[in-house]
From Swiss-Prot:
Domain of life: Bacteria
UniProt gene name: recO
Gene Ontology cellular component list: bacterial nucleoid
InterPro entries xrefs: ARFGAP/RecO (IPR037278), DNA_rep/recomb_RecO_N (IPR022572), NA-bd_OB-fold (IPR012340), RecO (IPR003717), RecO_C (IPR042242)
Gene3D superfamilies the UniProt entry points to: Nucleic acid-binding proteins, Recombination protein O, C-terminal domain
A GO BP entry: DNA recombination
Record NCBIfam families: reco
Name of the protein this chain belongs to: DNA repair protein RecO
Known role: Involved in DNA repair and RecF pathway recombination.
Family: Belongs to the RecO family.
Length: 243
């Protein structure tokens, strides 16, 4: 690749004695795997910038699944995530590493990701709000298009006071059954608008995104969720829910 491209490090691990294997999310090529040769050596000027949550400009080259990082520059300082916000960011990074195909264009999702990180860093909204909004954006970009505002059975607009049961690949159908797969019309409107004004709608959003993302994760648990739980256990006033 000849030009520079905006990117973030999703995950990095040591490779050989002095190199790094990087999973990166780029604006134009989606998720790419890059080998940063010599990045761990004492003389490398890449050490400080190849960190999660640092906006980068990168260039790479080569063939095959793993490309070679040619250059990388930090556009600005890393976004200041700490505490719950840091673990929320790690969750988002792991989610992208797990569900995105390599070298597929997710240019709009890149901006959703940036917006999520900026919201977490600024603490403009609760981490739960930011995560649910991003998960719904991610599902939309993965082609998981659902109509939250109409009953899949009748085609009628959802009623705030009625209950609808989620059926995979079909949508939401009016039902008298109230269980894990059931949502009120009010909760469905919140999902459609990606705005969650209270604990009830936030929990409903979490329930739905967990169900919808499960097939993409292949039954393998996310490590970041366990790290978050360990962090929460140490807090004097733990939050209502985990990531």
């Amino acid at each position: 690749m000849d030009g520079w491209e905006r990117a973030f490090v999703l995950h990095g691990r040591p490779y050989s004695e002095t190199s790094l294997m990087l999973d990166m999310f780029t604006e134009g090529h989606g998720r790419v795997r890059l080998l940063a040769k010599g990045a761990r050596s004492r003389r490398s000027n890449l050490k400080g910038c190849l960190q999660p949550f640092t906006p980068l400009l990168v260039r790479w080259g080569g063939r095959g699944e793993v490309k070679t990082l040619r250059s990388a520059e930090a556009v600005s300082l890393g976004l200041p995530l700490s505490g719950m916000m840091l673990y929320s960011g790690l969750y988002v990074n792991e989610l992208l590493s797990r569900v995105l195909e390599q070298e597929a264009n997710y240019s709009v999702l890149f901006f959703d990701y940036l917006q999520c990180l900026q919201a977490l860093a600024a603490e403009d909204v609760s981490p739960e709000q930011a995560l649910r909004q991003f998960e719904l954006a991610l599902l939309n970009h993965l082609g998981y298009g659902l109509d939250f505002l109409h009953c899949a059975g009748s085609g009628l607009p959802v009623d705030d006071g009625m209950t609808y049961r989620y059926r995979e690949e079909k949508g939401f159908i009016a039902s008298l059954v109230v269980d894990h797969y059931s949502f009120t019309g009010r909760e469905l409107r919140a999902l459609a608008e990606r705005q969650f004004p209270d604990v009830q709608t936030l929990r409903a959003a979490k329930r739905f995104t967990r169900m919808a993302l499960k097939p993409y994760l292949g039954g393998k648990p996310l490590k970041s969720r366990e790290l978050f739980r360990q962090f929460v256990r140490k807090q004097p006033d733990p939050p209502v829910d985990d990531a």
